[in-house]
């Protein structure tokens, strides 16, 4: 595992480092580490030519000398017409161009699924990584690369799933599957994959973190994260978990302790003394999975389950099932195990999209508007002379009016023959405009919405809009905040014969759902946070 960061970090990388509260500290901690793989000899150094036996060598030496002398006497010396080519540095280049080397990378066909169960077959080299597969699918489907696309390993027979880390070899993951297992690779967004680098305070609760040595003063979540990435000291994660007893269906509540060497449990209450700690699992030869339906599949006390599964193919008996009391506790355990298993490699995966972009500005790191759009200004053409609108409030009102005009034109196009009335425009607006938006999900239940948000990451601001199941002809905004999912009813309000949508009992009104979503993407309002990432179902 590579444990060093590149020194010559680009401007985009430094900008990303400033956004992360940990970047400056981690970059300093990563210096001075080497990679032993850089010193590995080339494969051709290990090959040995087949030598003839010593007796045969001595017996043929005299014959070769005689034959050489005869050849020299019989054949006259012919001058070389192109002496400059004998020592030309381009000779090897020409030879390589005329006789290309055979590609030694074997290719295999893999099948990748999306949320709607559509799939796509890809022919990939045997050494392709999960990041490269995601990039290939992004290019083939013309998606926007916002660095949240992720490859998942899905095990339906045991109800488990895990994030395949960006640096992992996909073919190696597939080689660990059993012949009769119907496992799948899923391609979807995961906004929470590296969220702990941006907001570590949500991932390490104070009551779950302790330190082997005494510390001076309070330790911040950023410092805790830095300790996970260092090689000297590691924090300890502790707390009660439900563990499934081997070979039984029963679960037992035990006090667990996570250390660098592995996961332990106490045989005597909450004691951390070595004589009371018993080894439970290590990280090197196993992967951490999240349980999708723990109660139904494994009879767990809660649905916040996770487990250790050996890398090699094995049955359900090899699983070490655990279960937390709440989502925040499970997230803390899983995140800490990932950090202890991969260490600095995770930080390198997080920083990889921002490195090596010296030829680009910081605006090219994330999907943004083009320079031509950013340079536009609001203009007023109503008077005799055109003028630039410098007042931001006036400019905003103009933009809203233009948006409403665009929506009315869309309603006219959606109407039937002839000029539609105001009521038909209103119905067309409510029925058709939001249907084309990726954040809107028609006829989605509350349970399906929660499952989709959890799949794409419990990050603050992840949201979707859906039809209300309890109140027909109304809508619900489902969003994530504080690692919990909240649902807000979008209430219809009528004023002077026109219908509006509101979240705050009519104090803020919107003519359609698009305007409502755009407003709360810029303003917190009555919501716990702004809307940041929408959940969308893609088709491959």
UniProtKB/Swiss-Prot annotation:
Superkingdom, taxonomy of origin: Eukaryota
UniProt-listed InterPro entries: BPS-dom (IPR015042), GRB/APBB1IP (IPR039664), Grb14_SH2 (IPR035034), PH-like_dom_sf (IPR011993), PH_APBB1IP (IPR039665), PH_domain (IPR001849), RA_dom (IPR000159), SH2 (IPR000980)
Keyword annotations of the record: Acetylation, Cytoplasm, Endosome, Membrane, Phosphoprotein, SH2 domain
Domain SH2: 439-535
Post-translational modification: Phosphorylated on serine residues. Phosphorylated on tyrosine residues by TEK/TIE2.
Pfam families: BPS, PH, RA_2, SH2
Chain residue ranges for the region called Disordered: 1-23
Entry GO CC: cytoplasm; endosome membrane; plasma membrane
Keyword Membrane among UniProt keywords: yes
Domain notes: The PH domain binds relatively non-specifically and with low affinity to several phosphoinositides, the best binder being PI(3,4,5)P3.
Function: Adapter protein which modulates coupling of cell surface receptor kinases with specific signaling pathways. Binds to, and suppresses signals from, the activated insulin receptor (INSR). Potent inhibitor of insulin-stimulated MAPK3 phosphorylation. Plays a critical role regulating PDPK1 membrane translocation in response to insulin stimulation and serves as an adapter protein to recruit PDPK1 to activated insulin receptor, thus promoting PKB/AKT1 phosphorylation and transduction of the insulin signal.
Subunit structure: Interacts with the cytoplasmic domain of the autophosphorylated insulin receptor, through the SH2 domain. Interacts with GRB14 (via BPS domain); this interaction protects the tyrosines in the activation loop on INSR from dephosphorylation. Binds to the ankyrin repeat region of TNKS2 via its N-terminus. Interacts with activated NRAS. Interacts (via SH2 domain) with TEK/TIE2 (tyrosine phosphorylated).
Protein name: Growth factor receptor-bound protein 14
Native organism taxonomy: Eukaryota, Metazoa, Chordata, Craniata, Vertebrata
């Amino acid at each position: 595992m590579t444990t060093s960061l590149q020194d010559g970090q680009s401007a985009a990388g430094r900008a990303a480092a400033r956004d992360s509260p940990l970047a400056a500290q981690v970059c300093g901690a990563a210096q001075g580490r080497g990679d032993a793989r850089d010193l590995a000899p080339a494969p051709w150094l290990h090959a040995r030519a087949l030598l003839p036996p010593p007796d045969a060598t001595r017996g043929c030496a005299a014959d070769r000398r005689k034959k050489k002398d005869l050849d020299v006497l019989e054949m006259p010396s012919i001058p070389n017409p192109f002496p400059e080519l004998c020592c030309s540095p381009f000779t090897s280049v020409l030879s390589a161009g005329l006789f290309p080397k055979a590609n030694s990378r074997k290719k295999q066909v893999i099948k990748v699924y999306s949320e709607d169960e559509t799939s796509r077959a890809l022919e990939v080299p045997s050494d392709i990584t999960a990041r490269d597969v995601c990039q290939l699918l992004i290019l083939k489907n013309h998606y926007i690369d916002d660095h949240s696309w992720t490859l998942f390993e899905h095990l339906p027979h045991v109800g488990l799933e895990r994030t395949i880390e960006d640096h992992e070899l996909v073919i190696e993951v597939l080689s660990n599957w059993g012949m009769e297992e119907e496992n799948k690779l899923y391609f979807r967004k995961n906004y929470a994959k590296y969220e702990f680098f941006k907001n570590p305070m949500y991932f390490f609760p104070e009551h779950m973190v302790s330190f082997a040595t005494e510390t001076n003063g309070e330790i911040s979540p950023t410092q805790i994260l830095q300790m996970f990435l260092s090689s000297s000291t590691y924090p300890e994660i502790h707390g009660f978990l439900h563990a499934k007893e081997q070979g039984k269906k029963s679960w037992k509540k035990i006090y667990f302790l996570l250390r660098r060497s592995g996961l332990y449990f106490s045989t005597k209450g909450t004691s951390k003394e070595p004589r009371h700690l018993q080894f439970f699992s290590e990280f090197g030869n196993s992967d951490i999975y999240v349980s999708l339906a723990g109660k139904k599949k494994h009879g767990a006390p809660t649905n916040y389950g996770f487990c250790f599964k050996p890398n090699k193919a094995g049955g359900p008996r090899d699983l070490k099932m655990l279960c937390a009391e709440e989502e925040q506790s499970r997230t803390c355990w899983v995140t800490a195990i990932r950090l202890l298993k991969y260490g600095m490699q995770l930080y390198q995966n997080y920083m990889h999209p921002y490195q090596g972009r010296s030829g680009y500005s910081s605006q090219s790191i994330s999907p943004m508007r083009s320079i031509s759009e950013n340079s536009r200004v609001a203009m007023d053409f109503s008077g005799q002379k055109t003028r630039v609108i410098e007042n931001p409030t006036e400019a905003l009102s103009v933009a809203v009016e233009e948006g409403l005009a665009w929506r009315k034109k869309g309603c006219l196009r959606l109407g039937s023959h002839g000029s539609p009335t105001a009521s038909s425009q209103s119905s067309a607006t409510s029925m058709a405009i939001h249907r084309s938006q990726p954040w809107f999900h028609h006829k989605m239940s509350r349970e399906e919405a929660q499952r989709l948000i959890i799949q794409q990451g419990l990050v603050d601001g992840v949201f979707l809009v859906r039809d209300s199941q309890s109140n027909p002809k109304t809508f619900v905004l489902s969003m994530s905040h504080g690692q919990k999912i909240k649902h807000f009813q979008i209430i219809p309000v009528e004023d002077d014969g026109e219908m509006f949508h509101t979240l705050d009992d009519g104090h803020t009104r919107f003519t359609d759902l698009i305007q409502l979503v755009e407003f709360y993407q810029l303003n917190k309002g009555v919501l716990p946070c702004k809307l940041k990432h929408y959940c969308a179902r893609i088709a491959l």
